[in-house]
A protein has these predicted regions:
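A residue-level marker of the well-folded mature domains of exported/periplasmic proteins
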Residues: 1-227
Length: 227
């Protein structure tokens, strides 16, 4: 926070994207000098992902969460949003939450261990890219594609390949292009002295990509493409 605070004190407008600082309430929270935070609502994203997973398994069965660490606010929010979705359905049981340290190989090992412990596992929520990649590798190795449903948070091209190959069943895409374009627009407005209409918080929407809609314009625009 300190470098951003110094920039602000030197008259440089500050906006944050993807992550907030302080408690995220820039109007009357613990940190108020940034003009705006432009980001996805990660709690809602986790809830959306696991609501879709629960529907995919028919509202019954066991669900496993993989996320990076217990210290990253975005991942904590996704985890907790997923847990809310699970708690709202009587037939679904949370069998565990593991932390992958953003390592796909660790996620693979953790998923393999969970499959041994819970052979009837029905669904996995990979709350970040590496967690989902590792889970997908374990499911593919076990020959359980389509049997264990996987929701992947974030939409790189590999996740879409896994989706098409029926290793992953749904991809929860943030919209980084939209986040970036809004940030540039608000930064320009701030430099021009037009700060009155810059919102203190913008939650950009998610796109849930499945095999049914992956080729639509909306889904294609949400995929994180390398070119």
């Amino acid at each position: 926070i300190s470098p951003l605070q110094r920039a602000y004190e030197q008259g440089i407008p500050v906006l944050t994207t993807d992550q907030y600082i302080g408690d995220g309430n820039y109007e009357n929270g613990s940190v108020t000098f940034p003009l705006s935070v432009i980001a996805s609502d990660n709690y809602e994203g986790g809830k959306i992902a696991c609501t879709a997973l629960i529907e995919a398994i028919g509202g019954e069965g066991s669900l496993y969460i993989l996320t990076s660490t217990a210290n990253v606010p975005s991942d904590i929010a996704r985890r907790d949003g997923c847990i809310e979705a699970i708690d709202s359905v009587e037939g679904v049981t949370l069998v565990g939450v593991d932390y992958t340290e953003s390592s796909a190989p660790i996620a693979t090992n953790q998923t393999q261990a969970m499959l041994e412990k819970e052979p009837e596992l029905k669904a996995i929520f990979g709350a970040n890219l590496f967690s989902a990649q590792g889970a997908a590798a374990a499911i593919k190795s076990a020959g359980l594609e389509g049997v264990v449903k996987i929701a992947s948070f974030d939409a790189p091209e590999q996740a879409i390949i896994d989706l098409r190959n029926e290793v992953i069943d749904m991809v929860i895409a943030q919209q980084p292009a939209l986040i970036g374009s809004l940030a540039v627009q608000y930064a320009y407005d701030a430099l021009m002295g037009n700060t009155a209409d810059i919102p203190a918080k913008v939650n950009t929407p998610f796109v849930v990509i499945t095999r049914d809609n992956v080729d639509t314009e909306e889904a294609q625009n949400a995929i994180y493409k390398s070119e």
